Each structure stands twice: as structure tokens, then as C-alpha cells.
Swiss-Prot record:
CDD domains: AKR_AKR13D1. InterPro entries: Aldo-Keto_reductase, NADP_OxRdtase_dom, NADP_OxRdtase_dom_sf. It comes from Arabidopsis thaliana (Mouse-ear cress). Its EC number is 1.1.1.-. Keywords: NADP, Oxidoreductase. The active site is at Y63. It comes from the Eukaryota. This is Probable aldo-keto reductase 5.
Length: 345
């Protein structure tokens, strides 16, 4: 296993945001991945991350919902807020038992002000649209976010799971600092169009689920140990008919990591880190031991030949099963109507 080393700093985007080269995805501490971690343990893990140099913290108002932001508010007391880069998101809500995506100006403003109150901060460093509302022209949504920047309520604007054309349209209204997207050895479809677009426009890339939602940490046995209320049990890639095939990738990565003297998770995470200094993966965990291992991935150095070998093992399309459940859209269906179609309420 590669030992944890110092966490370097990187510039995210072109507007001046500086973050730790690896972030902490906080979702699993409160939501979706089984029983939430006890609050005192969750806060201790967040503080350990910050003390270790992982200062880029990622949350959302839908995690819980809302309880993850409330957890962050407690973790950031007593001067801790000044040590971190805080990212949260809006745009997904539960309404009458259904998932809804919202990007109209009134909702954007109300969501931002609610997050500011919950996290108990004066300003959010990076505020993402979590999923694109395909009923609202993206120019309208970004226009309201631009006002929030001007009012000092948010510093930088981000998008999540947006298509290349949506990114371009948004960026024309106000500079987009970061795109959050799933990117890992088993989710490489973003490399064709999304990543080149971000790089052309100077937009940073925040890679969520860089360990394949834990797949590269445990392989197929991960599923056996999941709580019944863990959302991963419903994901297509974790269904047995797909898992029987997908485990081949884990076995090959595991064999390569053994030669490299690191864990499979560290090797998979190092691959993401080696994509460039404009990329910040945000692995999540509920265990300090795993957090230390994730930081250790920063010290795993891969040669061009090793990168090529990993990419040959995990060619786009190799993994079976969709990466998301159908109710959560991805960048592939995130186009919005033309601005000319918009009639304000």
C-alpha cells in the first residue's frame, strides 16, 4: 500500500479557485450508501481530512436531504470554515414522491439562500447545478447564478452532468469554474467530448465516483456487504449479470496494483490524478483508514506505459450496465430549450 503524503494544491478552472488536489465527497456520510455514520465519527473524519490537507469538501442539499449540509455546518465551526473550499449543489428535489430537477431563477435563489443558512456560512465557494433542468434555458439558470456571484453569496459557478453544448451556452453567460462528472476507469465516456470542451474553455474537472462507487476498493464482494438501503444495490453495474463480467476489470487492476505495491483503489485513483492538474477527484469514504489510503494514491506514480496498460484494460464500453439509475439524468440528456423560448413566470 502506498503511504499518504502531502496533498498538493491545484488551480480549478480559470477564475482563481485553488483547492486540494484531492477532495472529499461527503455524500456517503449521510445518504444513499446505507445507514448514515454517527455524527461524531463523521465530523472526526472530516476534521482528519482537513488536517491531512484534503480541504475541498463536496456536499449537496439533496444529500439526506439536507442533513449532509447540516453535518458540514457542525464540522466547520470554530474557525474550520476558513481552512476549506466548500462546494455544494442545488437542482434535485423530491416532490410528491418523485425526483424533480429545478433550474428556474426563483428556485435557484431560494436553494442558495437555504444552503447558506443550513451550512451557516456567508458565502459558498463553488455552487453547482446538480442536474440540468431541461425545461429551462441554461442561460436563464446561469443568469441567476451570476447575480448571486455579484451579491457575494457564491464565489464560483459549477455544473454537474452537463453536455458539451450546455457547458458552452452556460459559459457564454458567466465563466464556469468546474464541471463535476463521473470519471473513472469504469466510466470513460466523458473523454470523447466533455473533457476536451472543458479544457478548451478553461473549466476545471471534478471527478466524482473515481473509485467506481467503491468497486475498485472491494471488487464484486462489495455488493455482498451493502446494507439493504444502499442505493448501489439498484445500480445496473452491480447487478449479478453485469457484475460477473465487470469483475474481470477489478481482477486485472488488482493484479497490476500488486506489482506496483499499492492497493487496487490507489491504482484506480492514481489513474484519475494522472489525467492532469485540471482534474480533482473527490472520493468519498466513511473510514479514516480508507481516507488515508486515498491520499496515498497521490504518491503513486504511473509511467506512460502503465497508463496505457490501464486504459487498454478499461476501454470505453468494456464495463457492462449503465452507471446511473434511470431517474437520474446524465450529460447525455441534459440539453435545454433555446433562450428565445423562455417566458418568465
Amino acid at each position: 500500500m502506498a503511504e499518504a503524503c502531502g496533498v498538493r494544491r491545484i488551480k480549478l478552472g480559470s477564475q482563481g479557485l485553488e483547492v486540494s488536489a484531492q477532495g472529499l465527497g461527503c455524500m456517503g456520510l449521510s445518504a444513499f450508501y446505507g445507514t448514515p455514520k454517527p455524527e461524531t465519527e463523521a465530523i472526526a473524519l472530516i476534521h482528519h481530512a482537513i488536517h491531512s490537507g484534503v480541504t475541498f469538501l463536496d456536499t449537496s442539499d439533496i444529500y439526506g436531504p439536507e442533513t449532509n449540509e447540516l453535518l458540514l455546518s457542525k464540522a466547520l465551526k470554530d474557525g474550520v470554515r476558513e481552512k476549506v473550499e466548500l462546494a455544494t449543489k442545488y437542482g434535485i428535489r423530491y416532490a410528491e414522491g418523485k425526483v424533480e430537477f429545478k433550474g428556474d431563477p426563483a428556485y435557484v435563489r431560494a436553494a442558495c439562500e437555504a444552503s447558506l443558512m443550513r451550512v451557516d456560512v456567508a458565502c459558498i465557494d463553488l455552487y453547482y447545478q446538480h442536474r440540468i433542468d431541461t425545461r429551462v434555458p441554461i442561460e436563464i439558470t446561469i443568469g441567476e447564478l451570476k447575480k448571486l456571484v455579484e451579491e457575494g453569496k457564491i464565489k464560483y459557478i459549477g455544473l454537474s452532468e452537463a453536455s458539451a453544448s450546455t457547458i458552452r451556452r452556460a459559459h457564454a453567460v458567466h465563466p464556469i469554474t468546474a464541471l463535476q462528472i463521473e470519471w473513472s476507469l469504469w466510466s470513460r465516456d466523458v473523454e470523447e467530448d466533455i473533457i476536451p470542451t472543458c479544457r478548451e474553455l478553461g473549466i476545471g474537472i471534478v471527478a466524482y465516483s473515481p473509485l467506481g462507487r467503491g468497486f475498485f476498493a472491494s471488487g464484486p464482494k462489495l455488493v455482498e456487504n451493502l446494507d439493504n438501503n444502499d442505493v448501489r444495490k439498484t445500480l445496473p453495474r452491480f447487478q449479478q449479470e453485469n457484475l460477473d463480467h465487470n469483475k474481470i476489470l477489478f481482477e486485472k487492476v488488482s493484479a497490476m496494483s500488486e506489482k506496483k505495491g499499492c492497493t487496487p483503489a490507489q491504482l484506480a485513483l492514481a489513474w484519475v490524478h494522472h489525467q492532469g492538474d485540471d482534474v480533482c477527484p473527490i472520493p468519498g469514504t466513511t473510514k479514516i483508514e480508507n481516507l488515508n489510503q486515498n491520499i496515498g494514491a497521490l504518491s503513486v506514480k504511473l509511467t506512460p506505459e502503465e497508463m496505457s496498460e490501464l486504459e487498454s484494460l478499461a476501454q470505453p464500453g468494456f464495463v457492462k450496465g449503465e452507471r446511473s439509475i434511470s431517474i437520474l439524468t446524465t450529460f447525455k440528456n441534459s440539453e435545454t430549450p433555446p433562450l428565445s423560448s423562455w417566458k418568465a413566470a
